[in-house]
Swiss-Prot record:
One of its GO terms (biological process) is dimethylallyl diphosphate biosynthetic process. The modification N6-acetyllysine is found at K176. Belongs to the IPP isomerase type 1 family. Pfam families: NUDIX. A motif (Microbody targeting signal) lies at residues 225-227. Monomer. This is Isopentenyl-diphosphate Delta-isomerase 1. It comes from Macaca fascicularis. The keyword Transcription regulation does not apply. Mg(2+) binds at H40, H51, E146, E148. It comes from the Eukaryota. Its cofactor is Mg(2+). It is found in: Peroxisome.
Length: 227
């Protein structure tokens, strides 16, 4: 694996690069484990290294979507606006559990607490709904990028927020119209959004949002959407 100098990067974020992500093939079958660092180096991504991830979309009881702006300390896509929470299940027994995507849902609960300070009891795994998966690849800069099969997870609940400033620069709840304005600003270069959020917003999100009371029709655990 290539050696990359991380001396100039945020120390807290560099520590997280040692976490072990779940390596998968293109059909989401586990084939091993590798550090977060190696999973996010473009040099490895170009050789086909692929890992499991998730994206949470949390809506409050007014059907507004919680967005976050990634902190400037983040190694990939710093300062970008994105969906509620995006991260990776780790290669440990609890988060490797594939039955009903329980491991991924446990990981989502863990990261909602770590990033947004949402108490664990407010988002138990059984209230995190797994819709489908998308497979995408994107570069953050010349060194770092993403190559993931991303589990799409929906939560509908009012929650307590206490964000970690090392993870999150800002957050807001948005209506559909407000998100459309945000996407226009991104298209005009006024703000930055993450590529996975842009992909999901342009393809699936508004259709799902229109049917928050009837999401079962969109549940598809067989197909992996190649983006």
């Amino acid at each position: 694996m290539p050696e990359i100098n991380t001396d100039h990067l945020d120390k807290q974020q560099v520590q997280l690069l040692a976490e072990m992500c779940i390596l998968i093939d293109e059909n989401d079958n586990k084939i091993g484990a590798e550090t977060k660092k190696n999973c996010h180096l473009n040099e490895n991504i170009e050789k086909g290294l692929l890992h499991r991830a998730f994206s949470v979309f949390l809506f409050n009881t007014e059907n507004k979507l919680l967005l976050q702006q990634r902190s400037d300390a983040k190694i990939t896509f710093p300062g970008c606006f994105t969906n509620t929470c995006c991260s990776h299940p780790l290669s440990n027994p609890g988060e490797l559990e594939e039955n009903d995507a329980l491991g991924v849902r446990r990981a989502a609960q863990r990261r909602l607490k770590a990033e947004l300070g949402i108490p664990l009891e407010e988002v138990p795994p059984e209230e995190i709904n797994y819709l489908t998966r998308i497979h995408y690849k994107a570069q953050s800069d010349g060194i770092w990028g993403e190559h993931e099969i991303d589990y799409i997870l929906f939560v509908r609940k009012n929650v307590t927020l206490n964000p970690d400033p090392n993870e999150i620069k800002s957050f807001c709840y948005v209506s559909k119209e407000e998100l459309k304005e945000l996407l226009k600003k991104a298209a005009n270069g006024e703000i930055k959004i993450t590529p996975w959020f842009q992909i999901i917003a342009e393809t699936f999100l508004f259709k799902w949002w229109d049917n928050l009371n009837h999401l079962n029709q969109f549940v598809d655990h067989e197909k992996i959407h190649r983006m």
